[in-house]
Amino acid sequence: MAGKVTVAFFMFAMIAFLANFGYVECNPAIATGYDPMEICIENCAQCKKMLGAWFEGPLCAESCIKFKGKLIPECEDFASIAPFLNKL
């Protein structure tokens, strides 16, 4: 008797899992919403921490405000941070 209940429960769980398999999305940025300007300024701060005196953080933050967060800098992408680097 217990074996039949276990098998029935297992089958129900598998059917429920397979029925919902294609509908699950795990993207917290979309689920909670995000502000591109906030991400832009946070990335400027992160790049400043990583690159120190070689990175012009205030200039980066000003560009975030000027372009309303449309040009988000990526610290590991030279093309996106090139305008904010100085030669020392």
UniProtKB/Swiss-Prot annotation:
<comment type="function">
    <text>Neuropeptide that triggers the performance of ecdysis behaviors at the end of a molt. It triggers adult behavior patterns: larval, pupal and adult ecdysis, and plasticization during the molt.</text>
</comment>
<dbReference type="InterPro" id="IPR006825">
    <property type="entry name" value="Eclosion"/>
</dbReference>
<protein>
    <recommendedName>
        <fullName>Eclosion hormone</fullName>
    </recommendedName>
</protein>
<comment type="similarity">
    <text>Belongs to the insect eclosion hormone family.</text>
</comment>
<dbReference type="GO" id="GO:0018990">
    <property type="term" value="P:ecdysis, chitin-based cuticle"/>
</dbReference>
<feature type="disulfide bond">
    <location>
        <begin position="47"/>
        <end position="75"/>
    </location>
</feature>
<dbReference type="GO" id="GO:0008255">
    <property type="term" value="F:ecdysis-triggering hormone activity"/>
</dbReference>
<keyword id="KW-0372">Hormone</keyword>
<keyword id="KW-0732">Signal</keyword>
<feature type="disulfide bond">
    <location>
        <begin position="40"/>
        <end position="64"/>
    </location>
</feature>
<feature type="signal peptide">
    <location>
        <begin position="1"/>
        <end position="26"/>
    </location>
</feature>
<keyword id="KW-1015">Disulfide bond</keyword>
<dbReference type="GO" id="GO:0007218">
    <property type="term" value="P:neuropeptide signaling pathway"/>
</dbReference>
<keyword id="KW-0527">Neuropeptide</keyword>
<dbReference type="Pfam" id="PF04736">
    <property type="entry name" value="Eclosion"/>
</dbReference>
<dbReference type="GO" id="GO:0005576">
    <property type="term" value="C:extracellular region"/>
</dbReference>
<keyword id="KW-0964">Secreted</keyword>
<feature type="disulfide bond">
    <location>
        <begin position="44"/>
        <end position="60"/>
    </location>
</feature>
